[in-house]
Amino acid sequence: MRAIALYSTLFVLIAGALVIVAIHGGTNYAREFVDGYEHSIVRPSKEQQEHEPAAHTTGWTFSHRTQGRNYGLTEEQCNVAFPHLYREIDRAVQHRKDKWGNITPDELETAWRGDGIVRAQIHDNQLYIIDAHGVVDHNHRPRTVATLHSLHRAISAFQGKLPDIEFTFTVHDAALPDSNGNETTWAYTRREHQEKLWLMPDFGLWGWPDVGLRSFAELQEVLEHEEDEFVDKEPKLVWRGSVAVGSKDVRHGLVDHSKGKSWSDVQTLDWANSTNIQERLLSMQDHCSYMFVAQTEGNTYSGRLKYLLNCHSVLFSHDLEWLELYHHLMKKSGPDQNYIRVKRDFSDLASTMDRFSRPANYLQAQKIADNARRTFRERYLTPAAEACYWRAMIRGWSEVQDFQPEFWEEVTEYDKVKKKEVQKRKPRGAPFESYAIMEEVDWQLPAKARKMCIDE
């Protein structure tokens, strides 16, 4: 498929060059035409080359083809491969040092969040779940399971020693029940003023199977081998989503300003209507078959953004109020531009799309798509980068942790051998290996593991 598309493109270029020769009476103009195309889609600018990570001191360099799913990179390799990944961690650490001081055990209480919060610790490179608070419903459960698996993978793949820490994380769209709350926890997203929150990798970087995304790594693999060349994609802007969410303004704006346009494939979804879903829902691979993809925030952040950035397509996005750990890598202008910023109400969408949907501007559009693929799919959104981020977050948290986590707890148990009550020590919580099966911190024997699907 790719070979045919490539030869077709080359044929069109050569034919165009011959026509230009005939019209302009010379070869220089035609050569400039072909050279201009080659340079615009293949060779990064001098500034882009300068932004490439430096080589490892032993000569090691990162390649997404061979290292993209290497979950056990050393700390030095992580810094070489992903030098601009850790801004949110550095910010959170510095904020504690400048304003709040070190993290205390009192800040790890979970009662402030009614549900969807987990307390855990890492001891001797082992993940333990201390309290899984209200995470068994259809929304919180898959997020919790995915996040714990992702964190465990990053820990277990690493051959070095990680610091012992104790922490909490929430799996809500909005970590804080009060937008102006002051709690400290790990979260998927935050607003600019919520500076005590520490941003962790989103659960969707593991997988989101309940909406058809079986594995993030699998999506990247499929796109690497099956995605159409940019020039062969559907030259339209695609979006699917419900308007019954928190960010109604941006979604209604997108729908209103794309209605009836020849370049638009924007359609709303009604999740309560199975016929509507069957007719309109698109897979992420389907989204990547379009030249242009639209991003909107949802109840808070949008879980689809990281997937759309894997497409070799041009992303259109409004300014984002909810931050994720990689948002600072999105460039709206300059030689490294990797998406197109539109107004929050999408009022400038029509004029922008009228420009980029013209075939004469496909080369400029493709350069933006090239930059996005190079930055995200081939580097900063690889599974290897996610694992590196987790470990950097563990190190950063330990830097401002004001206590040594207690691994052991004293309990009174009946000793069947001594036939009396005795004082014993046991680890706090449950090791990940058992929690992954039981989804409980404690259980009675004979045990019964939680069912995979629960009707509510």
Q: What is each model feature region?
A:
Residues 2-276, 281-283, 409-422, 441-456:
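Secretory-pathway glycan-assembly enzymes, especially type II membrane glycosyltransferases
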Residues 287-456:
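Catalytic binding pocket for nucleotide-activated donors in carbohydrate/polymer assembly enzymes
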